[in-house]
Amino acid sequence: MAKISVAAAALLVLMALGHATAFRATVTTTVVEEENQEECREQMQRQQMLSHCRMYMRQQMEESPYQTMPRRGMEPHMSECCEQLEGMDESCRCEGLRMMMMRMQQEEMQPRGEQMRRMMRLAENIPSRCNLSPMRCPMGGSIAGF
């Protein structure tokens, strides 16, 4: 009986240590993610909140989704957008585009349904158009209202 009690106590200690380790890993991960988000916010500010990417997106959203030829004056915003993204760490580019999308949704536009899906597809593929890594930035459930 004493052997069972000792074994049970040892098992409880191991479980408690495992829980403490998992908790520490969660806290460490959360702190690292918060520090990374802060670094990305600073990079966004240095890159003017991706203002040219927003202008490019705005122009794209004003055009028909079936238009095949780009409008005159649109490509400079695209190349400036690429320069702004290139000025950010690779690890912050997608987070920066997500921040830009949330800002556009909250401050400038109120896209819904298909318009929101189109806007997200455009933003997801901006790195690819710029030939930057990562080539695609999934927006998925990270944007409110989608």
From Swiss-Prot:
Belongs to the 2S seed storage albumins family. InterPro entries: Bifun_inhib/LTP/seed_sf, Bifunc_inhib/LTP/seed_store, Napin/2SS/CON. PANTHER family: 2S SEED STORAGE PROTEIN 1-RELATED, 2S SULFUR-RICH SEED STORAGE PROTEIN 2-LIKE. Keywords: Allergen, Disulfide bond, Pyrrolidone carboxylic acid, Seed storage protein, Signal, Storage protein. This is 2S sulfur-rich seed storage protein 1. This is a 2S seed storage protein. Residues 23-36, 65-69, 143-146 form a propeptide. The gene is BE2S1. Residues 1-22 form the signal peptide. It comes from the Eukaryota. The mature protein consists of a small and a large chain linked by disulfide bonds. It holds the Pfam family Tryp_alpha_amyl. GO terms for molecular function: nutrient reservoir activity. The modification Pyrrolidone carboxylic acid is found at Q37.
